[in-house]
Amino acid sequence: MEKNIFLELEERGIIEQFIDRENLIKHLDEGNVPFYIGIDPTADSLHIGHYVGLMVASYLQKAGHSPLILIGGGTAAIGDPSGKTDLRRMMSREEMDENVEKIKKQVSRFVNFEGENAARIVNNADWLLNLNYIDFMREIGSKFSVNRMLAAECYKTRLETGLTFFEMGYMLLQSYDFLHLYNQFGCKLEIGGNDQWSNIIGGAELIRKLGHDDAFAFTFKLLTTKEGKKMGKTEKGALWLDKDKTSPYEFYQYWRNVADQDVENVLKMLTYLPLDEIKKLTSVEGQELNKAKKIAAYEITKLIHGEEEAKKAEEASEALFGNGANNANMPTIEIEAETSILDAIILAGFAQSKGQAKTLIAQGGITLNDNKVEDLQLKITSNMLSEELILKKGKKGFCKLISK
């Protein structure tokens, strides 16, 4: 008999908080439990933090449960106050609509929209933007205690700096989302990141207050290092799933260079590798862990960008470590002859300013074709660009410079 999917996710160290664990496990064993995960369209691409949730959704779907991917076109107009210290800039409807279309395409790569338990994309703008305020406050607002809401961590941290009533409405709207999906699609489970716990329990409790005892929720852990620092940040910013924002090579290199103590967690949360295989790969130390890192980098890149791009990234990475592969797949930037080394470093994304670039050179962290750069006044000449020219930052940052 296959292990219950909730227990498997627990064993992988993914689940953190939950409502009514024993009954949820029972429901998941008895048949298809439609579930939903929400994504706010506040950027035109998903990032690695979103993918943790999509992996959980993928696991649940593979176990026979139907995913509802909720695009928060309505709630994004307010903005979730969780983890925020100030009021988010409100997006225009046009911005949100553009982002929703791009995100829909990305999500479709990760969950299956065909079959008996096919995934479905819904947008809460469809039911939130035309709500009658008086009816909503009477039917939904009456079920929420302001005292209890203010005790929630997401609101408590904002009280000192100022919390608007506009933002307080976020919990009610997210809770209403669950109720709407429960009524329309039989959705019985909401999942989300552990920073969403206050908002997530609101929906399940609302449904239960209305007389239904089969509403459940659980949160998954955010992707963090052993020290508790969020993973997924690069020198250029977030680790995006859009290859135009983060190239497959840069994406691969991020996971190839993950810290030794984080490899096991990354493999558990971001791949489908069996736990016994992960244990075997990570039971070693030092240089022997490189095999696990390469497998993690390849598997995660394959899941996001496909096998062909993963192979290209792997080859480019091997080339940079002197194993004779082709450099053709390396990130490339076009520059004009006589560009200064400082500007080249900035264009490559290795520094945000000339001051930072100077510091990197002073620390011996910049090389051109493996020759350490020491001259702050160095210019990239046309002769240099006529041959292969590799700019490196330390052991982890690489790009090829070509003539514009």
Regions found by a protein language model. Name each.
Residues G79-G83, L131-M137, K229-E235:
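Short acidic, glycine/serine/threonine-rich loops at helix termini
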Residues R12, S92-R93, N99-V100, K104, ...:
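Divalent-metal (Mg2+/Mn2+/Ca2+)-assisted nucleotide/phosphate chemistry catalytic cores
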Residues G53-L60, L181, N199-I207, I300, ...:
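Buried hydrophobic packing segments
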